[in-house]
Amino acid sequence: MTNARQIFVETLTELAVKDPRIILIVGDVGFSYIEDFAKQFPKQFLNAGVTEQSFMGMAAGLALAGWKPYVYSMIPFVTMRNYEQLRNDVCYHSANVKVIGVQGSVHYKFLGFSHNIVPDDEDVKILQHLPNLKIYIPTPEEVRQVVLESYSQTNPAYIRL
């Protein structure tokens, strides 16, 4: 089975080697996948902790200053907890922020409903009305192509892994 998160990090690593403007911002998650990126690119990595509203606002500001931020966290944390910042700061300004949501449905059911999306397309239903936001829902085999395509564009994007 192909792992979408691992493919995402590998592809982002390839891009970060060539582009020092890439910065990966995580919300205190993903350590089994992002540790190598963090070690290889310490100046292009920020663990913002559980500050979803703040890290989305930071990403918007960084994008408007010429950086290429990728915000990575569990789906509810990058779509619901910071919806206002995503809407107002990222989408309305068409900021070049790539939002990476991981683990749909009830993958984290042992952590309660705050860590899950039910129904499975809840995130897409919430985001589909936002201006300038391109939504990608790739299969694991499509992740590399989607990351490369979204990198080449300057609009905000949501990639659901």
Residue ranges and their predicted role:
Residues 1-161:
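Thiamine diphosphate
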